[in-house]
Curated annotation (Swiss-Prot):
Annotated organism of origin: Nitrobacter hamburgensis (strain DSM 10229 / NCIMB 13809 / X14)
Keyword Cytoplasm: yes
GO biological process, one term: DNA repair
Subcellular location(s) per record: Cytoplasm
Role this protein plays: Can catalyze the hydrolysis of ATP in the presence of single-stranded DNA, the ATP-dependent uptake of single-stranded DNA by duplex DNA, and the ATP-dependent hybridization of homologous single-stranded DNAs. It interacts with LexA causing its activation and leading to its autocatalytic cleavage.
UniProt xrefs under CDD domains: RecA
Name the record gives this protein: Protein RecA
Residues annotated as binding ATP: G77, P78, E79, S80, S81, G82, K83, T84
GO cellular component: cytosol
Amino acid sequence: MSQAALRIVEGSSMDKSKALSAALSQIERQFGKGSVMKLGKNDKSMDIEVISSGSLGLDIALGVGGLPKGRVVEIYGPESSGKTTLALHTVAEAQKKGGICAFIDAEHALDPIYARKLGVKVDDLLISQPDHGEQALEIADTLVRSGAVDVLIIDSVAALVPRAELEGEMGDALPGLQARLMSQALRKLTASINKSNTMVIFINQIRMKIGVMYGSPETTTGGNALKFYASVRLDIRRIGAIKERDEVVGNQTRVKVVKNKLAPPFKQVEFDIMYGEGISKMGEILDLGVKAGIVEKSGAWFSHDSQRMGQGRENAKAFLRANPDITAKIEVAIRQNSGLLAEQILVGSPERDADGEEPAED
């Protein structure tokens, strides 16, 4: 250290405010202004900027109105559960606000036609299909450090294959290689993510642990680093099929907020994902309207302000699609009652997450 170290004196004889001022001035000389500041004076830390997830119910369940910018988010679940769909809806919502989004397609499986149907402006979406995990994370680091990207999706952690594994032979045992890669990348990325206010969404897959007798045998790939660095972790599951006559036209989906550093966790919400359409906004407005008491349900009939909307859920959804004014009115009322709804949304017990452990808020 070029500056002389502060002299340590007895607590009884020192003036704490003067000592603190001296320490702060030394830190600012050495590391620059703003290296240490009072939390309340840092406006950025007080105001959480969010982007809608594309699901009205999930935005309410998250407690802050959407997914937070400047943070790491993990979306995990079984195959075909809606992980990429949810991430693409977030991209579409960010683009509506004029944001720049990037998609690192490590799985080489992004369908631009499906993305366009979800509302993504594919002509404005930056995409990279890297050859190996190190390249993917270097590209992510460069994009985050630029400060120009609002949302960055990495799909998926399981597909971030280390270069050494690609160059090796089939059957080579390389234990912990991907976990070390993720741990190093997140150590580098985390400060840049906060400074650039970029939301980084990692999509992850589920694997089964062998020989587990108690708790959940499920675990996510890529080691434990992502679990610690993520501010929000979402567990998405398909819980049923939506049929039109005998044809399956969509999935009933449940999302549980397993970890949330910004609001109380463990809330869960259900919505419909329709094939070729994505998250069904009409279905959510109908379900949340019933929970908030804005839409009345009597038997199979749905009604609003004494006006019948239809018999059965699908007919009521069709009525909402045909009457955008009524839909907008119900949506405004739902948003005004979001505090009440947040309490009514089923709060799951802190069940064991995808690692057989009780999730912590950190």
